[in-house]
Amino acid sequence: MINITGLNKSYGKKKALDNLTLSIPSNSIYGLLGPNGAGKTTLISILNGLISYDSGEVTFFDLPLKKNLSAIRQRCSLIPQSLAFYENLSVKENLQFFAGVQKIKGHTLKDNLSYAVETNRLSSMMDQKSATLSGGQKRRLNIAIGLLNNPDVIFFDEPTVGIDPESRNDILDTIKAYKSDNKTVIYTSHYMPEIEKICDEVAIMNAGQIVKQGSISSMVNNEESQQVIVELYPHSSTYLSAMSRAEVTIVDQTTLLLTQSSSELIAQVLHQLEQQGIKIKQIRYGATTLESLFINLTSKGRTDV
């Protein structure tokens, strides 16, 4: 569906995207994760034709983006984090206005409007002023506006910001249902439970590159991604602080947490402890969470882009 190969984008001397390669399958909900400055906004802006890129190749539906930008944009929709409608207008007036902006008319308008309203359960509030809607209802109106062109690909940017847990779950269920309507969803969020609940696959970005991608289960259940807990006997050594780095967390004086289980890292840590005369009580494996994996993969190389 969406194939990105060797994508590069710089702002002056700062590289926002660095030879980024990614494939997003059709009819899936794909999570895009990354710390601030990882390049997510730049990537989403490129995919929506809002900014150009320096080099590389992007295709939608096997069509090159640069040569087919207008046709591709008609099949995509970006639903922003900020509320993009007029609060002084009713729900119906907002939907009609934005349909007019997109020049959607006739039977197409009727069908698309019906789909947008029904999937977001707005039928009972069509004549209500948008300013009087609850936080969750405003979010649903925001989504409905983004569905007026009946897109094949929907980009969601933090769609549940600032709403209560019940409304959040309601919106997530709505988004999950779009997959069964043969739509592809690209979903960005900093809230890991959301990603785990609705996404089929995830890509983790850092410093303009994809550092990990695949299904969440394959990521967290990968043998080398497992956490290793090293429990120590009480000791008076001050050496532990020198061992702290991205892969090794000093929980306390008697506990180390290794955020990956490679035999090389384990052997290195055990050798260092032995050299310092620190005795090991036990070593055990713990389950890795998406959040701990994310922190481990993105703890270095952050930029300001």
Identify the residue ranges that each predicted region occupies.
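Conserved ABC transporter NBD signature motif
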Residues: 56-67, 71-72
